[in-house]
A protein has these predicted regions:
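Basic, Lys/Arg-enriched alpha-helical interface segments
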Residues: 1-70, 79-83, 90-123
Length: 123
């Protein structure tokens, strides 16, 4: 089975927010999250609940629970067969806050817009 590419979203300054979020986690939690990312690369969009779930449209969440804390990474698959990791966060409740969804949507749009070919000008 061919592995899927998994990439960290980069903002306009070249910052990788999910990578920065991972750096702030304990070694134990980071290892578990990285293992889950590897599972996503292995299975691609076929990886489903309880490991991932759909948020809305193409936006999905990678799910991991460690102790009482839920860790999430919002991501989507772009047209080049790459999983793009958009936003990482932890939470204590079962729902994803609208503010986190908004960040995920904005970063997904920014990624798609950056990758879209420039429109040819009419002469």
């Amino acid at each position: 089975m061919e592995r899927w590419q998994v990439e960290f979203f980069k903002d306009e300054k070249g910052t990788e927010p999910v990578k920065n979020w991972l750096d702030g986690l304990s070694n134990e939690v980071r290892g578990k999250v990285l293992a889950r990312i590897d599972l996503l690369a292995e299975h691609g969009p076929a990886l489903d609940f309880p490991f991932t779930s759909q948020i809305e449209g193409r936006l999905r969440e990678m799910r991991l629970r460690f102790g009482k804390t839920r860790y999430r990474i919002l991501y989507f698959f772009d047209d080049s067969r790459s999983g793009i990791l958009l936003h990482g966060f932890s939470k204590d409740t079962a729902t994803v806050e609208e503010a986190d969804k908004k960040i995920g949507r904005a970063r997904m749009t920014a990624h798609v817009d950056r990758k879209a070919p420039a429109k040819k000008r009419k002469k």
